[in-house]
Amino acid sequence: MKTKKNTNAVKRLQCAALLLPGLSQTAVAGRVEETYNADFQYGHYSESNRRMEVDIFQGALSAPIGSAMTASVNLVRDMVSGASPVYNFKDANGQVRQFISGASPTSSCGKSICEQRDAISSGLTYFFDGASVNAGGGFSREHDYTSRYFNTNLSFDFNKKLTTVNFGASAAFDEIAPSPSTWNSRDSAFKAHKTSQQYLLGVTQIIDKESLLQSNISFGYHSGFLSDPYKWVAFYDGNAFSDFQQDKRPRERFEWAWLNQYVRHFGQFNDAALHLDYRFSTNDWGINAHTFEASWHQPIIDDWQIIPRFRYYSQDKADFYQTVFSGRSENYSSFSSDYRLAGFGAISAGVKLSKEVKSIGYAESLKFQTGVEYYDHSSNYQLGGNGSNNFSNFSYYLVTASFNLKF
């Protein structure tokens, strides 16, 4: 009986591993998905003061092909509307303020930003005894941005399937064609390109019948046009305005990240699971970032589950970031006032509630899930920060609803 109990515990941990981001096909390399899966998710993102709003629609379908292969296809549509920070300036008192793009009577939604992004991706996974190989690609398009990307992943199980090693690689080829507007002075024929490469090495280890640990190291290299064509930078001589230039960033960026994830199963709490994640990332632009996340997966009754979640994030500013610059632009090789490159911290908390219904007609199971998340972005939350960028603080909430059908 002890052997059977231990085996069941290992299976529960393997299922818990499948809940970790990026592990749905790699945590158990030899595991073939034997059912058809259809997924749909809707999300609504809204920033404070309704500055920016996004509606996200996602659909996915996966199906077995024979006894050793799975195919998948994913569709995404994002619809964005609102306003965005364009540049920073000094007011009459010398205080730095943020200029936000306003309403536009000529746009389809009456706001300065009306975007729609459509994306499609697909993949094939072939399962061996104790290994799997995955290859896929995708295409994403907006009116001013097009991306084509490819990816592959290899996974190997050994140590009686208690250890899994993952190798991953991806490449993206992007084309940027900024739309002529008040904040883009480039010629309408202007086009730029960007390429990205990502590599991953990871290990997933079942420690004992109640716990699992995953560790990933990833490397990335980006080259080409890495600036934001709709951002501007102001230069001052003291408090006197001296120059105004478009965002100019280095044409290369190298980055690496280390992610550690720990899962602990608690059978005494109705098979609950604790997930703890820590991620450190750094790049040669000078941005070091820390992310800590904790979530508790609690089955309740009759296949209901609740998942409260907490996340903390902190990053340093880029070497070439300033709210406004002193002197003239000729004195700087790169410059940006984009708040995303500033030093800041963020705290978010949320909860998800799901219900699974089994054996519905021809379907094996149907799972519904809804969730809400609140995010607060502030320079005061930065590790070692001084709150100097508090003019760009904001918050948002994200509401999601989804279903998964297995048949």
Where are the regions that the model predicts?
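Short loop/turn motifs that connect adjacent beta-strands in outer-membrane beta-barrel proteins
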Residues: 26-34, 67-68, 130, 159-164, ...
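Short glycine/proline- and aromatic-enriched beta-strand/turn motifs that initiate or cap beta-hairpins
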Residues: 28-65, 72, 375-377, 398
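Membrane-embedded beta-strand positions of outer-membrane beta-barrel proteins
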Residues: 38-40, 73-75, 135, 165-169, ...
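Transmembrane beta-strands of outer-membrane beta-barrel pores
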Residues: 42-46, 77-81, 128-130, 139-143, ...
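Outer-membrane beta-barrel translocator domains and adjoining extracellular loop/strand segments
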Residues: 51-54, 74, 84-90, 137-140, ...
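Hydrophobic, lipid-facing positions within transmembrane beta-strands of outer-membrane proteins
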Residues: 55-59, 118-122, 148-152, 195-201, ...
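Outer membrane beta-barrel transmembrane domains
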Residues: 92-109, 217-263, 280-293, 297, ...
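Outer-membrane beta-barrel "beta-signal"
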Residues: 154, 210, 351-353, 394-407
